[in-house]
Design a protein with these regions (language model features):
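Intrinsically disordered, low-complexity boundary segments flanking structured domains
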Residues: 1-2, 6-9, 70, 88, ...
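PLP-dependent aspartate aminotransferase-fold enzymes
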Residues: 86-178
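Active-site and channel-lining beta-strand-loop segments
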Residues: 19-42
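Short secondary-structure boundary/capping elements
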Residues: 22, 53, 81, 163-166
Length: 178
């Protein structure tokens, strides 16, 4: 595949994409079309925390495919794997946090967290850490500290601020509405 096709037909989400053509992955490595291995510190934006092509993950996916691929993540249908996962998670949480909101991406989880924070507190302001990545939706961009990625999409969500970590003076940004 030509790099020119990549830049011509696929939207870029960062100013300087790596543009490595990946042919396959195994364990903690991704490989380019010349079979050069790279240690994968991105891990599918944390989706591959067990590594690529882990045998137990492959087996679980194949077993599930024999039943059904996907019906819905929003709690409309009883799906045994989802119920088992949420039950397992609840064993490690306080009684007041026994329910789990399942999503299909980290960005969607961030959007859910933003809504939950506003709903649970009744407050409008959101404080986030500078230099944190949360995704590419409007809500996620609003609490991301990378101005270079945010600029083209303004105006973003109102009442959001990004503060520096480990800087006590930044705590002044917290108000009664945070």
């Amino acid at each position: 595949m030509a790099d020119s096709d990549f830049f011509k037909y696929q939207a870029q989400t960062t100013p300087h994409p790596l543009a490595l053509e990946i042919s396959h992955a195994e364990g903690c490595y991704i490989y380019d079309k010349n079979n050069k291995g790279y240690l994968d510190f991105v891990a599918g934006v944390s989706a591959c925390t067990l590594g690529h092509r882990h045998p137990k993950v492959i087996k679980a996916i194949k077993d599930q495919l024999d039943k059904y691929l996907h019906v819905m993540v929003y709690g409309e249908y009883i799906q045994k794997p989802a119920v088992e996962l949420t039950k397992l998670l609840s064993k490690h949480l306080p009684e007041s946090l026994k329910k789990t909101y399942l999503t299909n991406s980290g960005t969607e989880a961030i959007e859910g967290a933003l809504k939950l924070a506003r709903r649970a507190t009744g407050k409008s302001e959101i404080i986030a850490a500078k230099n944190a990545y949360h995704g590419n939706t409007i809500g996620a961009l609003s609490i991301m500290g990378f101005e270079e990625r945010k600029q083209a999409f303004r105006p973003l969500l109102p009442d959001t601020k990004c503060i520096r970590l480990n800087d006590e003076a930044q705590l002044e940004h917290i108000t009664e509405q945070t």
